[in-house]
Amino acid sequence: YGRSSAFRLQPDLNCAERGGERLEGLILKGVGSFYTVLDADGTEHVCKARGRFRKESISPAPGDRVVFTHKTGEDGSIAQILPRKNLLTRPAVANVDKLMIVMAASVPKPDLLLVDKLLLQCAQTGIVPALIVNKCDERERETFDAIFHQYAASGYALHAVSAHTGEGLDALRAEISGSVCCFAGQSAVGKSSLLNAILPELSLAVGGLSRKTERGRHTTRHAELWLAYGGALVDTPGFSLLETEAIEPEDLAALYPEMRKHAGECRFAQCLHVSEPGCAVKPLLDNGKLSRERYERYLLILEELKEKRKHRYD
C-alpha cells in the first residue's frame, strides 16, 4: 500500500522518452504552484505547471495523468494533462471513480442538503456515490435509521462504520477496492480518522469540534491521493457549502434515481413533480415509498436553480 505500489493503479501508464527526460506520471498532490508527481517506477518528482495552462485557464489536479519533463537536480515541468474522465471542484480532484460521502451518526448533525448536492455532482460527472455514516459506536442509531429511510429508494450504497471500533470497515474496504475513491463531507465527521483506520500509515491529522458551534476545525489542507487496495484514496478539505453546477431546473429530477425511474409515468414529459396534474412521483410521497424530507430538499434546490437562471438572464 501507500506510494510504493506505484502503478498497479495505472497499468497502462508507462514511461515515455525516458532518455529525453520526458515521462508520464500521476499527480498525488498540489501545494501552491508545486505538484508531486509519481512516475511508473514509483519515484516522486516535484513539478511546476507550464505557463500555458494559466493562459488556457486549466489547472492540474490530484488524480491527473500528466506528461512531464525532468532533469536531475531540478524541478520538473508538467507539459501536458492527459484526457480526464471527470473533475471534481472545490477542491479539485480528477479521474474519480467513487465518492465516499461521509456523515456522522452523532455530531456534527448531518447536513443532508450538502449530501444531496454532492450526489447531484456525482450524477453529473458519472461518479458512483456511497453514503458513509461514521461514529456509529456513539450509538445514535436513530440518526443512521433516519438517513437510511431517506435514501433507501435511491439505491445508493450505505455503510454504517466506526473508525474507533472498526465496525463496518471490512465492507468499506471492499467498496473502495480497485477504485479511485474521494472522501468528502462536512468538517469533523471523521474523514481523516476513517482513512487512518483503513490505511494506518497515512497518519493524517485529526481535528475536533468547536465547542461553541459544534462545527469542525479543518485538518486537511490540500486534497492528496494515496495508492491503496489496487486503487487510490483521496482525503479532501472539509467544507460546509457546495454550489450546484450548471443544472437546468427541468433536468434536476432526472438526477434523482428514485424520481427518474417514475418519470415516464407522468402525464407531462418535463414534469417537475411540484404541482403538475398527472404527476406520478407525488403520490409516492403520500404512501411512504419516497422520502418527504429528501423531496423537500429537492424543492429547495429546484428554487435555487430557478433563481440562478433568472439572474443569469436579467
Annotate each language-model stretch with its function:
Residues 138-189:
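Canonical P-loop GTPase G-domain recognition
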Residues 21-31:
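Structural detector for short beta-strands of small beta-barrel domains
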Residues 73-81, 109-111:
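Short, Lys/Arg- and Gly-enriched loop/turn segments at beta-strand edges
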Residues 43-52:
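Short, structured beta-strand/loop micro-motifs enriched in basic residues and often containing a Trp
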Residues 35-39, 47, 68:
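SH3/SH3-like beta-barrel fold
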Residues 192-204:
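A conserved segment at the C-terminal end of the G1
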Residues 33, 51, 57-72, 82-99, ...:
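Helix-rich effector regions associated with P-loop NTPase G domains
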